[in-house]
Amino acid sequence: MKEFDLESYDYYLPKELIANYPVLPKEKAKLLVYERRSQTITHTTFEHVLDFFPKNALIVLNDTKVMKARLFGSKHAFLPSKTTEVFFHRFFKDNTALTQIKGKIKVGDKIFFDENYYAEVLELLHNGQRLIAFYDNQTPLNQENILKLLEQYGHMPLPPYIKRADESLDAHEYQSVFAKHTGAVAAPTASLHFSQHGLEKLLKDFKHAFLTLHVGAGTFLGVETKDIREHQIHTEVLRIPKKSQEILQKSQEILCIGTTALRSVEYFKRLENPNQEAFECDIFLHLANPILHVNYLLTNFHLPKSSLLMLVSAMIGLEKTKEIYKIAIEKKYRFYSYGDGMLIL
């Protein structure tokens, strides 16, 4: 069936529609509103996004905070040039970390970030990840100090389709105004559309709940299996506070700010009697595993053959998704992380 064929999720996007910078002020970004019941499309801007939110809906937001996850170092302490890139993914046990390292690397290699700080490669994993430990003058760093190291020496992990180095503006623009808990290596991009003023109005006028899904590097990986149902999605760290769990259990109408919030809600609502706050979320939503508990979604425009495009198709159907994306391209909407948005009602 074509809805499970990977090629059905391909489309052509002109390069000039890939957003390399955000629209400022945020409210000026374009917004496509699709109302499923009436099959109508409205073209507007984020100045008016809250006008379209259903008044009784619970608004769910992901408050993860993006780490400065890209580090550049040298394999020799005395070399001034830093050409080896370490992409921090997540903490592992005993203050070690899972990373990607560009170039040839072997167990025991060290990567120096300055005269004191360095990382040592502990293990080469089968999936291309490298297990490393961080040190300050041979003293192992704990997680708190590793985060300080990333903040001091790291760069914002802009997506690979943004063909430029990170700049000072990315430190705050590639971060939602309600980001709170550090741990993501990619921003939950629908959240980027809210200014402080917009957030305050949302929190004042609507029921809301926060959760934390630390977006992982796997979010940039495309689906590669010919039958999308065979795809194994990446696992991400999820935390839902008890207060938010109680609100979610009681709510009948839910609007998620972004696909990460939606995946989190769908994962949680399918659990039987959850009795903890921390989870490992690995839910892959598509037409054979449809959305059951979320009614509305605010999202950006996603990459061809991506799991996120399949999620949108699970909500409105493959043909309607293709139709809307065709219209968005014709109307010169800006795509991907720094791009414009789409509200599905």
Swiss-Prot record:
It comes from the Bacteria. It catalyses: 7-aminomethyl-7-carbaguanosine(34) in tRNA + S-adenosyl-L-methionine = epoxyqueuosine(34) in tRNA + adenine + L-methionine + 2 H(+). Pathway: tRNA modification; tRNA-queuosine biosynthesis. GO terms for biological process: queuosine biosynthetic process; tRNA wobble guanine modification. InterPro entries: QueA, QueA_dom1, QueA_dom2, QueA_sf. Transfers and isomerizes the ribose moiety from AdoMet to the 7-aminomethyl group of 7-deazaguanine (preQ1-tRNA) to give epoxyqueuosine (oQ-tRNA). Belongs to the QueA family. This is S-adenosylmethionine:tRNA ribosyltransferase-isomerase.
